[in-house]
């Protein structure tokens, strides 16, 4: 499996749970409470009855928190923060030991549970910087002035969760379209009331689903770049194009950014905005993620006539 062949999972449609987004398997099977006892942290997406096309893996950059389930008092309930593009493979490596790719700090100190993961970072650099700050809050210039210390009755995980909430509210991460996912919903703790995640941060539960984007060679699956719906000028380069995540209207990236900023001068691009065509709200990080997907499809496209065209969405 390719490192980046992973994307976001929503709940299993066939399994209805009283808790939104929590697969029934978690509730009905106590053995799946711990990730080292579950078959996978990644649920494969199956497309039945679809014509086979070449695909590109969708990008995934995540920073996770492990909890030790060791029977040894010295290691039990310790936390480990890490970065991954493949949560399933990473937890297997941690529990298999250092020789199998696990970390030095998790070797012989488990088994380990991957309890939560924060994903939606635009690239690996942004995720790795978040990982380092989460590991080293006393050194990170972003939050070191807060002098965050573990309270006497606070569990190691509750302390790490509090640090993560502070980081998600700091630049640049508070401008990203992040998702906080409880991989093991039974381990969920309430977020600190005084430092909740940003309002645009998604909260999800359950597994992460592998996802790929098809590269169709059918002309009918593409549309022309056309004109920007704001300035009415032609969009010359595919790299200049972004589209609304609701109505799929095309814009110059710069035009939509200026429109979304609505006069704000302290930012280069908006965090949230309203589409000038359909008036639906969008998260800028989702718009850019879609743009990156369009460019990756173009790069992998073998039909030169389609390279500068835009893959259709359900809205287009």
Model-found features: residue ranges?
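Non-catalytic localization and substrate-recognition regions of ubiquitin/SUMO ligases
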Residues: 243-245, 263, 287
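The −1 position to Zn-ligating cysteines in a subset of zinc-ribbon hairpins
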Residues: 227, 243, 251, 255, ...
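Cys/His-coordinated zinc-finger cores
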Residues: 249-266
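A short beta-strand-loop micro-motif that forms or neighbors metal/cofactor-
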Residues: 262-280
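A short N-terminal helical cap/helix-turn-helix that marks the beginning
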Residues: 145-167
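Short arginine-rich
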Residues: 103, 133-149
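GIY-YIG nuclease catalytic motif and its immediate N-terminal context
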Residues: 1-129, 159-241, 276-316
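Detector for the canonical C2H2 zinc-finger "Cys2" submotif
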Residues: 232, 247-248
